[in-house]
Amino acid sequence: MAKDGPRIIVKMESTAGTGFYYTTTKNRRNTQAKMELRKYDPVAKKHVVFKEKKV
């Protein structure tokens, strides 16, 4: 069974449509809104915006 705490695992999916994603954790008490980060997508070979999706 999963650990019930303030930190949850989230999937950051590329908006370039390549299907590439990162997994990271976030504190659900401090960061309640969906995260958006600009990270490198090796499939697209450039920096793109990654949006939070459910795992």
UniProtKB/Swiss-Prot annotation:
What gene is it encoded by?
rpmG
Matches recorded under SUPFAM superfamilies: Zn-binding ribosomal proteins
Q: Which domain of life is it from?
A: Bacteria
Q: PANTHER family given for it?
A: 54S RIBOSOMAL PROTEIN L39, MITOCHONDRIAL (PTHR15238), LARGE RIBOSOMAL SUBUNIT PROTEIN BL33M (PTHR15238:SF1)
Q: Which family does it belong to?
A: Belongs to the bacterial ribosomal protein bL33 family.
> Which of UniProt's keywords are assigned here?
Ribonucleoprotein, Ribosomal protein
- MF terms (GO), sorted A to Z: structural constituent of ribosome
Q: Which HAMAP family match?
A: Ribosomal_bL33
Q: Which PROSITE patterns match?
A: RIBOSOMAL_L33 (PS00582)
From its record, what is one biological process in GO terms?
A: translation
This protein's GO CC annotations: cytosolic large ribosomal subunit
This protein is called Large ribosomal subunit protein bL33
